[in-house]
Swiss-Prot record:
The record marks R17, K24 as: Transition state stabilizer. Keywords: Isoprene biosynthesis, Nucleotidyltransferase, Transferase. It comes from Xanthomonas euvesicatoria pv. vesicatoria (strain 85-10) (Xanthomonas campestris pv. vesicatoria). PROSITE patterns: ISPD (PS01295). The keyword Transport does not apply. This is 2-C-methyl-D-erythritol 4-phosphate cytidylyltransferase.
């Protein structure tokens, strides 16, 4: 599998639910910024041609990475929402990326992506005309709450899944979906929702339960605990988490190009 897929990583958010002055994607974990593990997990797959990171205007915390594991890293200016940042990333991709090429979108603060899950998503998703997302079946019992905090009922869970990332779609279809949602004033919470609004049905590809998004201090502590259990990520070829020193040496920079909307 040759490098042909670009990944968009929206990283312009401030992570207000996490608290603190530093955006969660830059919080240290195992001696490296959290997002370093995210980008390394993507770059570990041979199908990756490059990564476009959408950052906030004036982001002083961006390390200026230009490559990870020889995979190019570019940046563009993100927007006020996740959807706006993803759209900016799609429009800022190099001219070599065609309209009907598949593009990945992955959360900046989802560092625990397994290489096997990414491989399965690409294998299944690229065989579908629409694309696919990583997801996990809902296993807990779901309760519907009333206005008073009491239980109004139990919801069937048999056909419910939790959406994860990465999500894989054709570039032109995702641009259209995000553009139409924005024009309609609809806030889409993931890329699949934008596709669904157009009547398209992406595939669900089961991913690991530990591909979690870091949104709270407890989530960060969980990821750090996993790194410790792995010897700060000392890994065999199947793991996506290099040892901290190895991870640091995998990144090149500073001096990453930052393109604004006026360059698109």
């Amino acid at each position: 599998m040759t490098g042909s897929i670009w990944a968009i990583v929206p990283a312009a958010g401030r992570g207000t639910r996490f608290g603190g002055p530093l955006p969660k994607q830059y919080l240290p974990a195992g001696g490296q910024p959290l997002m370093a593990y995210t980008l390394a997990a993507l770059a570990a797959h041979p199908a990756l041609a490059g990564i476009m990171v959408a950052i906030a205007p004036g982001d002083a915390d961006w390390p200026g990475w230009t490559a990870v594991q020889s995979t190019p890293v570019l940046t563009c200016l993100g927007g006020a929402s996740r959807a706006a940042s993803v759209l900016a990333g799609l429009l800022a991709l190099p001219e070599s990326v065609r309209a009907d090429d598949f593009v990945l979108v992955h959360d900046a603060a989802r560092p625990n992506l397994a290489l096997a899950d990414l491989d399965r998503l690409l294998e299944i998703g690229r065989g579908d005309p629409v694309g696919a997302i990583l997801a996990a079946p809902v296993r807990d019992t779901l309760k519907r709450a009333g206005d008073d905090g009491g239980i109004d009922g139990t919801e069937p869970r048999e056909r419910l899944w939790r959406a994860l990332t990465p999500q894989l779609f054709r570039r032109h279809q995702l641009i259209r979906g995000l553009t139409e949602a924005a024009a309609a004033g609809v806030e889409v919470t993931d890329e699949a929702m934008a596709m669904e609004r157009m009547g398209l049905r992406p595939l669900l590809v089961e991913g690991a339960e530990d591909n979690f998004k870091v949104t709270t201090p407890a989530d960060l502590a969980r990821f750090e605990f996993e790194l410790v259990n792995r010897g700060l990520g000392a890994r065999d070829p199947e793991s996506a988490h290099p040892q901290s020193s190895v991870l640091a040496s995998a990144f090149s920079g500073p001096g990453s190009r930052v393109s604004g909307p006026e360059e698109i």
